[in-house]
Every structure is written in C-alpha cells, then in structure tokens.
A protein has these predicted regions:
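Tandem repeat scaffolds
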Residues: 2-206
C-alpha cells in the first residue's frame, strides 16, 4: 500500500480531533496512547497511523479507508459494524479484538498478532493474512471471498459457518483446528495437515 506521506496533517490528540470533526482525511498519528474510549460514526481516510496504542476500547459504525497501521496495539478493542477498506496492518497487535458485523475489503494483515480475535457475522473480500497469528481465534458466520493465508498460525482456531472453499492452508499451522466438514470442503491442505482433520471422518488411524 502506497499512501503519500506528503501533505499529511500531523495530529496529537485523536479524541480531540474526533470531537471537532466527523471525518478525518490525510492525517498522521504517531506515538499516541489511550484506553477505554468509545468512538462512534467517524470516518478516517488516506492516513498513516504509527506506534499508536488504543486498547480496551470500542469503535462503532466507523469507516477506515486507505489507512496504513504500523506497529499499533488495539488489544481487547471492539470494532462493531465497522468497515476497513484498502487498509494495511503491519506489525500490529490485535489480540482479543472483536470484529462484529464488519466489512473487510482489500485489507492486509502482515505479521500481526490476532490471537484470541473474534471475527463474526462479517464480510471479508480480498483479505490477506501473512505471517499472522490467529491462535485460538474464532471465525463464525462470515461471508468470505478471495481470502489468503500465507504462513499464518491457525493453531486451535475455531471456524464455523465460514466456508474455506478454494482457500490454500497448506503453508499454515492448523494444529487443533475446530471446523466442520462443510467449512473445510475444497480447501487445500498438505498431507501432514490431513492427519489433524481425520477426526472429521469419525475414523481412527492405527
């Protein structure tokens, strides 16, 4: 993702800016830390957010368009009915986050800690998880199209009513994955991974 660093407006206090504006465009936010905040119906676009910590917070009906998040921490934050369009998360921490009724479109997660994250009742299209941890995460009741996992850690992930049809998992860790036959059907796996999924057939290997 290439967001021009020129003509970005440096802001110091995100909450103050949000109180004064419904839409924030071409901003740069760095070294910002806060927690337990609630942000409602805000749109942020064409911006870069670096080294920012916003934890244990709640974003509702917010839109993030053309945003680059670098080295950010949003642990245990709820994103309710939000949209992420052409966004990129690099080296971020999203542990324990809840993405409920979200739209994720053309969005990349690169080297991100998403362990214990919940993504539910959401639409995911053209989403890329590269070298990203999704241990003990929960994907439930989602509509997905053209999502890609590259060397992602899906250990003990729970996937229900979220079809992985056509998705290549062969380079991912899937130890202890909980998934139904219908959801894993037509996904690509390797021979070792097949042993982790043999339980779905109700048989034992001796």
């Amino acid at each position: 993702m290439n967001i021009s660093k020129h003509n970005l407006i440096q802001i110091q206090d995100l909450q103050k800016e949000i109180e004064e504006n419904d839409d924030l465009e071409k901003i740069k936010l760095e070294e910002y830390e806060t927690e337990n905040i609630e942000i409602l119906k805000i749109t942020i676009s064409k911006s870069i957010i670096n080294n920012t910590t916003i934890i244990n917070s709640n974003f509702e009906k917010c839109m993030f368009i053309d945003i680059q998040f670098n080295n950010c921490n949003f642990s245990n934050t709820i994103f309710e009915n939000c949209s992420f369009i052409r966004c990129e998360f690099n080296n971020c921490k999203l542990t324990g986050c809840n993405f409920n009724e979200n739209t994720l479109l053309d969005t990349n997660f690169i080297n991100v800690n998403m362990n214990y994250t919940n993504i539910t009742i959401s639409d995911l299209k053209n989403v890329y998880f590269k070298e990203t941890g999704l241990k003990n995460a929960n994907l439930q009741n989602n509509k997905v199209k053209n999502i890609k996992f590259q060397e992602a850690d899906l250990t003990q992930i729970q996937i229900f009513q979220t079809s992985l049809n056509g998705i290549d998992l062969s380079k991912c860790k899937i130890d202890g994955i909980a998934i139904s036959i219908d959801d894993i059907k037509w996904a690509t796996i390797n021979q070792v991974q097949a042993l982790d999924l043999i339980y779905l057939l109700g048989v034992k290997i001796i």
